[in-house]
């Protein structure tokens, strides 16, 4: 979440100064700061197209007036995206069928791979052969979308490898998954959690909002058992696949919302999706939450504050502060980290470790 409502904070030092004051009622020790490289740090980019005089340009929307402006280069985007952008544009300009009613493009990269999604205001079945030629000639994983339709050429799944404390963690996901869009910062974030766990007495882990297992796979070796929940069926399927890729056998996934899990743990409701999982077999010493911008609702806070240790990854300092007002009644902030996920913007990712008072 942007800090622009509080001031024009762009550098990590400026963000740090603001956060230090903003959270002073909860934390007065030193913050850990994790910087990103200044350029080519972002693995996802979404662009519009501008059509003029029968040719095509990449474009973005000005957030102030909502008007399109032409762009030629994205210095924040991964090098693979920057290298491929002119190749794709040149190809599209030469194919009238591909160019017609094309309104957007999404790029997604990992350390190894790149996928491209083209967005159309027309029936993409009519240009299927053109799209296939594009994929083959430019050697690219291609997805095309229009209303109610989706075509995939080669594959929509990407492989990723993260280096965490000398270990390689393998992942597979696609463009529909929520991903941390700065791989370097993602590795630093996971490593920060691992370094904290190295000093802890650990039993089992409860993780909410696990996605495709970004944190789950890296943290599993620290615990006897892990229960990870996620509402997206496709994310759960990727998480199960990622367990296979890493030969990990101590993670149990449940397709439940955090509110449903709360009801199940309190034995207020039974869920068929938990038929193979005995909640009473878990002894949670730690809980990890990585919620959306809205933060945690009261039912989730009431659930997690029962546990000894809480790791809270936040993309919104505003809702984080609101949640800490509740959590600080039972827990104390022991560590606070700032991750400069989006360089030279007012956005900031926070990591907080709390232990029971």
UniProtKB/Swiss-Prot annotation:
The active site is at 315 (nucleophile), 349 (proton acceptor). It is an enzyme of class 2 (transferase). Signal peptide: none annotated. Coiled coil: none annotated. The keyword S-adenosyl-L-methionine applies. The keyword Transcription regulation does not apply. PROSITE patterns: SAM_MT_RNA_M5U (PS51687), TRMA_1 (PS01230). GO terms for biological process: methylation; tRNA processing. S-adenosyl-L-methionine binds at residues 180, 209, 214, 230, 290. GO terms for cellular component: cytosol. One of its GO terms (molecular function) is rRNA binding. It catalyses: uridine(54) in tRNA + S-adenosyl-L-methionine = 5-methyluridine(54) in tRNA + S-adenosyl-L-homocysteine + H(+); uridine(341) in tmRNA + S-adenosyl-L-methionine = 5-methyluridine(341) in tmRNA + S-adenosyl-L-homocysteine + H(+). Keywords: Methyltransferase, S-adenosyl-L-methionine, Transferase, tRNA processing. Its EC number is 2.1.1.-, 2.1.1.35. PANTHER family: TRNA/TMRNA (URACIL-C(5))-METHYLTRANSFERASE, TRNA_TMRNA (URACIL-C(5))-METHYLTRANSFERASE. Belongs to the class I-like SAM-binding methyltransferase superfamily. RNA M5U methyltransferase family. TrmA subfamily. Dual-specificity methyltransferase that catalyzes the formation of 5-methyluridine at position 54 (m5U54) in all tRNAs, and that of position 341 (m5U341) in tmRNA (transfer-mRNA). This is tRNA/tmRNA (uracil-C(5))-methyltransferase. It comes from Campylobacter jejuni (strain RM1221). The gene is trmA.
């Amino acid at each position: 979440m942007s800090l622009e409502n509080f001031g024009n904070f762009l550098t990590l030092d400026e963000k740090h100064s603001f956060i230090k004051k903003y959270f002073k009622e909860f934390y007065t020790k030193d913050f850990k700061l994790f910087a990103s490289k200044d350029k080519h740090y972002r693995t996802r980019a979404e662009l519009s197209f501008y059509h003029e005089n029968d040719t095509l340009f990449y474009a973005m929307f000005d957030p102030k007036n909502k008007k399109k402006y032409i762009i030629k280069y994205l210095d924040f985007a991964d090098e693979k995206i920057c290298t491929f952008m002119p190749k794709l544009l040149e190809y599209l300009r030469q194919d009238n069928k591909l160019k017609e009613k094309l309104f957007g493009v999404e790029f997604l990269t990992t350390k190894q791979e790149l996928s491209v999604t083209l967005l159309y205001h027309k029936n993409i079945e009519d240009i299927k052969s053109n799209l296939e030629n594009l994929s083959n000639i430019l050697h690219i994983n291609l997805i095309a979308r229009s209303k109610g339709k989706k075509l995939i050429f080669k594959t929509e799944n990407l492989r990723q490898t993260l280096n965490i404390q000398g270990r390689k963690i393998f992942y597979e996901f696609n463009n529909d998954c929520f991903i941390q869009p700065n791989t370097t910062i993602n590795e630093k974030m996971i490593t920060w959690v691992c370094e904290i766990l190295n000093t802890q007495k650990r039993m089992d882990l409860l993780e909410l909002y696990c996605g495709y297992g970004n944190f789950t796979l890296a943290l599993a070796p620290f615990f006897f058992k892990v229960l990870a929940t996620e509402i997206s069926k496709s994310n759960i399927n990727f998480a199960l696949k990622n367990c296979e890729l890493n030969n990990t056998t101590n993670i149990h996934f449940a397709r439940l919302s955090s509110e449903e899990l709360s009801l199940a743990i309190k034995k207020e409701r039974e869920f068929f999706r938990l038929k193979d999982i005995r909640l009473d077999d878990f002894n949670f010493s730690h809980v990890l939450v990585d919620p959306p911008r809205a933060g945690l609702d009261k039912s989730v806070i009431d659930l997690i504050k029962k546990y000894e240790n809480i790791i809270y990854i936040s993309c919104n300092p505003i809702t984080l502060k609101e949640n800490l007002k509740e959590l600080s009644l039972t827990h104390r902030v022991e560590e606070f980290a700032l991750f400069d996920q989006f360089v030279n913007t007012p956005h900031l990712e926070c990591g907080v470790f709390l232990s029971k008072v």
